[in-house]
């Protein structure tokens, strides 16, 4: 069932190990644990540190960071699924398949991050993820994750 509540920044910090300047999810718009699906948001501002060098006169969000934002959104859902185990285990980004970059992301854009898992197990997971700006598909990829004990890293 689709959860009605939005997950805002303070709660995200309990679900993800990332912090500024590498936290690339601003809030979760919706999630469905049973369907293994999540939709999150990243507000792309001119103040992002990466825009200083990518590119100063024509700022574009690096594609690898769009993929990272998608992975972080997926990581939030893994944290919600783990529930009682999330203090002991962590999802590590394992791989990217079938990545396509269709459109540039610029300051002022709002990225909508969608991840739908085909697999979540005790060892890891696999999700199809898409990023959109104004309903236009900008990036898509298959993401895979490994679940490991936090003490082992």
From Swiss-Prot:
<keyword id="KW-0443">Lipid metabolism</keyword>
<dbReference type="InterPro" id="IPR029069">
    <property type="entry name" value="HotDog_dom_sf"/>
</dbReference>
<dbReference type="Pfam" id="PF07977">
    <property type="entry name" value="FabA"/>
</dbReference>
<keyword id="KW-0456">Lyase</keyword>
<protein>
    <recommendedName>
        <fullName>3-hydroxyacyl-[acyl-carrier-protein] dehydratase FabZ</fullName>
        <ecNumber>4.2.1.59</ecNumber>
    </recommendedName>
</protein>
<comment type="similarity">
    <text>Belongs to the thioester dehydratase family. FabZ subfamily.</text>
</comment>
<keyword id="KW-0444">Lipid biosynthesis</keyword>
<comment type="function">
    <text>Involved in unsaturated fatty acids biosynthesis. Catalyzes the dehydration of short chain beta-hydroxyacyl-ACPs and long chain saturated and unsaturated beta-hydroxyacyl-ACPs.</text>
</comment>
<dbReference type="GO" id="GO:0006633">
    <property type="term" value="P:fatty acid biosynthetic process"/>
</dbReference>
<dbReference type="InterPro" id="IPR013114">
    <property type="entry name" value="FabA_FabZ"/>
</dbReference>
<feature type="active site">
    <location>
        <position position="54"/>
    </location>
</feature>
<dbReference type="InterPro" id="IPR010084">
    <property type="entry name" value="FabZ"/>
</dbReference>
<dbReference type="GO" id="GO:0019171">
    <property type="term" value="F:(3R)-hydroxyacyl-[acyl-carrier-protein] dehydratase activity"/>
</dbReference>
<keyword id="KW-0963">Cytoplasm</keyword>
<dbReference type="GO" id="GO:0009245">
    <property type="term" value="P:lipid A biosynthetic process"/>
</dbReference>
<dbReference type="GO" id="GO:0005737">
    <property type="term" value="C:cytoplasm"/>
</dbReference>
<dbReference type="GO" id="GO:0016020">
    <property type="term" value="C:membrane"/>
</dbReference>
<keyword id="KW-0441">Lipid A biosynthesis</keyword>
């Amino acid at each position: 069932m689709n959860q009605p509540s939005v997950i805002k920044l303070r709660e995200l910090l309990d679900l993800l190990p990332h912090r500024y300047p590498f936290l690339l999810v601003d809030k979760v718009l919706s999630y469905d644990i049973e369907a293994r699906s999540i939709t999150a948001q990243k507000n792309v501002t001119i103040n992002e540190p990466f825009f200083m060098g990518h590119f100063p006169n024509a700022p574009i969000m690096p594609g690898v960071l769009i993929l990272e934002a998608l992975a972080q959104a997926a990581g939030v859902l893994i944290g919600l699924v783990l529930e009682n185990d999330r203090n002991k285990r962590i999802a590590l980004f394992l791989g990217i398949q079938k990545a396509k970059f269709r459109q540039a992301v610029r300051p002022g854009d709002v990225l909508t991050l969608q991840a739908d898992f085909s697999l979540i197990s005790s060892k890891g997971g696999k999700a199809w993820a898409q990023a959109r700006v104004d309903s236009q598909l900008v990036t898509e990829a298959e993401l895979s994750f490994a679940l490991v004990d936090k003490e082992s890293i």
